[in-house]
Curated annotation (Swiss-Prot):
It is found in: Secreted. Keywords: Disulfide bond, Glycoprotein, Knottin, Secreted, Signal. Its main location: secreted. This is UPF0506 protein SJCHGC03047. GO terms for cellular component: extracellular region. It holds the Pfam family UPF0506. InterPro entries: UPF0506 (IPR021712). The keyword Disulfide bond applies. Disulfide bonds join 116-130, 123-134, 129-139.
């Protein structure tokens, strides 16, 4: 145990000494370089390395383009997070349809907002179906609605 501590102390002392030597040698090198450089050489170097800064050129379209975010914003603040007809929806609170629109799913959490669901489409509530009849999670024909020929 004592030998481990002694070795650790020896390593720390060696590391500290080597850092001090490196700092001293770096400082002397910098001082020697400072003495060798004259003021005119320094000014010439600064002029050569400095670029002339010109006015930044903006693209011509920046004034006429409307940001994409502005185009997708809903009309009222109440509809901030809902989608309009034809847009992507997922039947979650994050991607839901506005108003009376319903989400017609095409895959797992992947759908489109429509007015109502057609026959044999996945449904949860009868109000989602155009026929107003949802049975076993599918929109069905409504047998109570009959077309009367004239």
């Amino acid at each position: 145990m004592n030998t481990c501590i002694q070795l650790l102390i020896l390593c720390l002392v060696t590391l500290t000494n080597s850092e001090n030597l490196t700092d001293i040698s770096t400082e002397t090198t910098i001082e020697n370089e400072k003495e060798d450089v004259t003021e005119t050489e320094l000014l010439e170097t600064i002029e050569n390395e400095t670029e002339t800064v010109t006015e930044t050129e903006l693209p011509e379209t920046i004034g006429t383009e409307i940001p994409a975010e502005a185009l997708n914003l809903p009309q009222s603040p109440k509809q901030k997070y809902c989608k309009s007809e034809g847009q992507y929806c997922s039947r979650t609170i994050f991607h839901r349809c506005c108003g009376n629109l319903v989400c017609q799913l095409h895959g797992f959490f992947n759908g489109t907002c429509v007015q109502c669901l057609a026959e044999r489409k996945f449904c949860i509530w009868s109000s989602e179906c155009c026929s107003k009849r949802c049975r076993l999670f599918r929109c069905r024909k409504n047998p109570y609605v009959q077309v009367i020929p004239y």
